[in-house]
Amino acid sequence: MLIVSVGLMLCQKWFIYTVNHTTSLSGKVYVIKKGEPVQKGDLVGFLWQGQIKYPKDVIFVKIVSGVEGDRIVVKDRDVFINDKYIGRAKKQSADGKLQLEVISSQVIPKNEIFVSTPHKDSLDSRYAKVGTINKQYILGKAYEIF
């Protein structure tokens, strides 16, 4: 029993496990390797800052779609990063309760990333109230378990 307890404590030092309760990504369970740097295209685990809908410090997993220095361009409500189509920003949430403003065209600031998923109902950086995510809230690189 002691060996199992020590093993679990060591795992918690380096890893975080989280469950995805939405359909924005295909996986349901993810492991986040604490402190592992992320690059464009990686899954990232980060702490939600409570801007809308979910409480502060809920763990979110999204795809890194843009990094500092990348150019976000919005045309109508279509969002592009460095001319790559990311997705369309909806006018309201899937349940119709929230009005959603699209992020503004800009260069992603230093120490920030743009996160998204391909799902049309994903609450991500396409929306002004979410915006880019500061690196201080990034937990690490995420991996889908199942």
Indicate residue ranges for each PLM-predicted region.
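Protein maturation boundaries and topogenic segments
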Residues: M1-I59, V107, A128-F146
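Short, exposed beta-strand/loop patches in secreted or surface proteins that constitute
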Residues: H21-T23, V64, R71-I72, S105-Q106
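Acidic/glycine-rich C-terminal interaction modules and beta/coil loop segments
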Residues: A89, D95-A142
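Structural motif
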Residues: Q39-V44, D70, E112, P118
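Mid-length scaffold segments of soluble, non-membrane domains
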Residues: P55-I86
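Short, surface-exposed secondary-structure boundary micro-motifs
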Residues: G35, Q49, R77, P118-H119
